[in-house]
Amino acid sequence: MSLKGRALRYLAAREHSRAELERKLAAHAESPEQLAQVLDDLQAKDFISEARVVESVINRRAGRFGAARIRHELQGKGLAPEAVAGAVNSLKASEVERAREVWRKKFGEPAADAAARGKQMRFLAARGFGSEAIRRVVSQAED
């Protein structure tokens, strides 16, 4: 299969950043120049778009994860720092509501004791929610 065909197959499954495609296709390319040419061509035809990658990750992950976890995933995809920062800033506004919804699905009722409260807080922290959002969600549940 041609390099361009492989790239299109990856892109048909989901949005990929240029850096992700470089990593995945490097083993199949005859030369780095050939790989760069294919990726330049795909980018010129708008098959590769950082904005769509960011939007895709946010749509898939925002309901289950906090801004820190999503930031880490976006950085791992090799996206521009400005695009990552913009996406994370847009998520910060709804952080408490999203954390509350994740907490409600997992626990649904206030913690009975300090150990249970710690477990709930650690769960939300592992999901990438900020400490302020976690404190607000867990303390409001007890009220």
Where are these regions (language model features)?
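An alpha-helical, amphipathic repeat domain used for nucleic-acid recognition
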Residues: 1-143
